[in-house]
Amino acid sequence: MGKKDKTEIKVEEENKEKKQYKKKKEREELEIPKGIDPWKPLELKRDDVGKRVLYDDSSFATLFPKYREKYLQEIWKLVENVLHEHGIECKLDLIEGSMTVTTTKKCWDPVAILKARDLIKLLSRSVPFEHAQKVLNDDYNCDIIKIGGFVRNKERFVKRRQRLVGPDGSTLKAIELLTKCYVLVQGNTVSSIGPWNGLVQVRKIVEDCLKNIHPIYNIKELMIKRELEKDETLKNENWERYLPQFKKTNQNKKKKVQKKKKDRDAAPFAPPQLPRKEDLAMESGEYFASEEKKRRKIQADREAKHAESDQKRKDERQKSQIAPAEKDRSTTTTTNTSNIQDTLSNIKNNLKNNKRKEAPTNNADDFVLKKNKK
């Protein structure tokens, strides 16, 4: 019996190996035709599902700001019509400022309630209805990125958020074209709608932008990747050698820690320990005195301090009452007379030096023309 069991086991192992070989061969023979995505989810239709799928109601609710109230009132009928196709009810509460989405017995897609939740979230974040309704399709998903906690300084935050949008929205348009996603920057959030691959790229660009990495670097990288995807020879190769590697130009300005020079004259050992209050009291004998003596001494010291402070206050008051010292008039008169004498002597010297020169005597004959002698 034992021998038969061994032979049977060997036969089973051989059959397994043959089956595995056949499977590998079949896989190699199978070829996916071009233009078909094998990872694309299959569409779920109403005919593929039974009459009733959900046996319990589930609901989601979100709040919306006051400035969205008017727009939501205008498009709410469209929202109801779109969600009614999936068997979902929606309510708009203007008093509380909330939107609620609930499943019904007619709901045949269990994922539809999650898609409806994303729809009302996007509508509350100022996304227009034309773009928000795309979330209900299987090919589209949404991602709401919170950017409020990346930067503390408000001015710096506004500057980096504007950098993400770019001049006339050019940077945002480039991101949308490369990632195949719709992107909207609103307040402290960035909403994006598109395929999963594009949403991951959008999140990376947004987070890097708020970490002070310009979006142009990521945009360049995406452009190079898109060109490399077209080349069939480079599809299965590593692309790191083709991608640009940007280095930081702004270095962190850290203060250099200066090493302290050792003083040669400094003592090699630590200074002696200072005495405590108890030690000083023991030396003076106060430590062994009775409590009454200690109290009397404290009182005497306190009175002496009060007396000293009172004396200082009296001296300051008396200073204001003391008349200021008069100036000596004799010194002022002597200085004035000496100044007057100096000025007079200077004037006399100037007159002597600048005497008028005597004018030359002029005769009448000097002004008459003399006849020329023949």
Curated annotation (Swiss-Prot):
SUPFAM superfamilies: Eukaryotic type KH-domain (KH-domain type I). GO terms for cellular component: nucleolus; small-subunit processome. Residues 250-262 have a biased composition (Basic residues). Pfam families: KH_KRR1_1st, KH_KRR1_2nd. Residues 1-26, 245-374 are annotated as: Disordered. One of its GO terms (biological process) is ribosomal small subunit biogenesis. Residues 1-34 form a coiled coil. Belongs to the KRR1 family. Part of the small subunit (SSU) processome, composed of more than 70 proteins and the RNA chaperone small nucleolar RNA (snoRNA) U3. This is KRR1 small subunit processome component homolog.
